[in-house]
Regions:
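Fold-core signature of tandem repeat domains
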Residues: 24, 34-36, 43-45, 57, ...
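Extracellular beta-strand-rich, repetitive "passenger/adhesive" scaffolds
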Residues: 1-2, 27-29, 46-50, 65-70, ...
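Glycine-rich beta-solenoid repeat tracts in large extracellular/virion proteins
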Residues: 8-11, 15-17, 32-39, 50-60, ...
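Consensus "Asn ladder" position of solenoid repeat domains
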Residues: 62, 90, 120, 127, ...
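Glycine-rich repeat segments that build the extracellular carbohydrate-interaction surface of secreted
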Residues: 1-29, 38, 42-46, 59, ...
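Short beta-strand/loop motifs in extracellular/secreted proteins, especially
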Residues: 202, 263, 285, 314
Length: 344
């Protein structure tokens, strides 16, 4: 019988699946750890599935469709923890309500991810606000709702950078358990190390980043989401961050940090910044058409948008910012024009 002409129905069958060129269906039920190790499969995860172990996709070029009411309770890893060349070219599409998280009782001693994308050419496609990737904070532990090109084993970037990924139409959140858990809480962190100078080529678009809390100056600064970096941190070079919405941090830090060379940041809504709404730290970035407002306590002395004095040839154009009526323009040879700044 030709491939794809038969269906492999999997009911409660956890473990490693090494099939290739097959049509695999996960039927409604509970699963422990699952690994998709085969290549070129069409995989359907039916409504009502629950995965209590980690869901790993280490095979290449699989098409995975996730239907309504599916829970991944111990995270998803696309690729391998320390490699960008494992689990390449997979397309994961969510059609309905999907929830990806981690059990705090299973956290390691330092770094936690809910959605870890390490394989090159990954396309993650959510279904808007119905697709939620959320992680609860924990004292003394760094928590990331989503990372691209980073290792859970030591919290660092993979040595060979992950490239050419698309992440879209997903709700990424950091959740608080009611106590002050310090810094190092991120909704998304993209690559790292020296990858800012490398053309990683990611597209991150039409996502919502937040914390489920509104801006509140009465909350301890130790309870912010940022740790001085940003709720969303883009270190990968030549990355496009387009038409995203970043909701409140608490106090301190910044909402968006752009630390990759030649990144393009367009048409984003960056709300409720801490120290700054957005910070641009690297050369040749285009930052245009963004709405960035409400820095720390609406302080009129702090810029909503800041560029680093060591950066070169940044373009800031057509942005709307508040509260201070200026952009910090320390970068060499930067072009700053046609921005509307001040009280919103």
């Amino acid at each position: 019988m030709p491939k794809y002409a038969q269906t492999i129905n999997i009911e409660g069958h956890s473990g490693i699946h090494s099939e290739e060129y097959e049509r695999i269906v996960f039927t409604r039920g509970n699963y422990s750890a699952v690994t998709i190790a085969g290549d070129y499969n069409v995989i359907i995860i039916n409504a009502g599935c629950r995965f209590d172990g980690k869901f790993v996709v280490s095979g290449d070029y699989n098409k995975i469709t996730i239907h309504n009411d599916v829970n991944f309770n111990n995270g998803i890893l696309i690729g391998a923890d320390t490699s960008s060349t494992v689990g390449q070219g997979n397309h994961i599409k969510c059609l309905g309500k999907t929830f990806i998280t981690r059990d705090p009782n299973d956290y390691n001693d330092h770094t936690q991810y809910a959605l870890q994308i390490n394989g090159n050419y990954t396309h993650w496609e959510g279904s808007g606000m119905n697709t939620k990737v959320a992680l609860q904070t924990a004292s003394g532990k760094t928590t990331y709702a989503c990372v691209i090109g980073r290792q859970a084993s030591d919290g660092n970037a993979v040595s060979t950078p992950t490239k050419w990924c698309i992440v879209e139409k997903t709700n990424f959140m950091v959740l608080y358990d009611g106590s002050s858990n310090g810094s190092g809480k991120y909704s998304m962190y993209v690559n790292g190390s020296t990858h800012g100078a490398i053309a990683c080529g990611h597209l991150i678009t039409n996502n919502w980043f937040g914390t489920l809390g509104e801006y509140d100056t009465s909350i301890s600064a130790g309870q912010d989401t940022t740790g001085g970096g940003g709720q969303v941190v883009i270190v990968a070079g030549t990355t496009r961050f387009v038409e995203n919405h970043i909701q409140p941090v608490y106090t301190g830090g910044s909402n968006l940090q752009v630390a990759g060379k030649r990144d393009i940041v367009l048409f984003n809504h960056v709300a409720h910044g801490g120290s700054y709404g957005a910070v641009v730290d690297e050369d040749n970035v285009i930052f245009s058409g963004n709405l960035v407002y409400w820095n720390d306590a609406k302080n009129s002395s702090t810029e909503p948008i800041r560029n680093n004095s060591s950066a070169d040839r940044i373009v800031f154009a057509g942005n709307r910012g508040g509260q201070k009526a200026s952009i910090s323009t320390n970068a060499t040879n930067s072009q700053v024009g046609n921005n509307e700044l001040g009280t919103l």
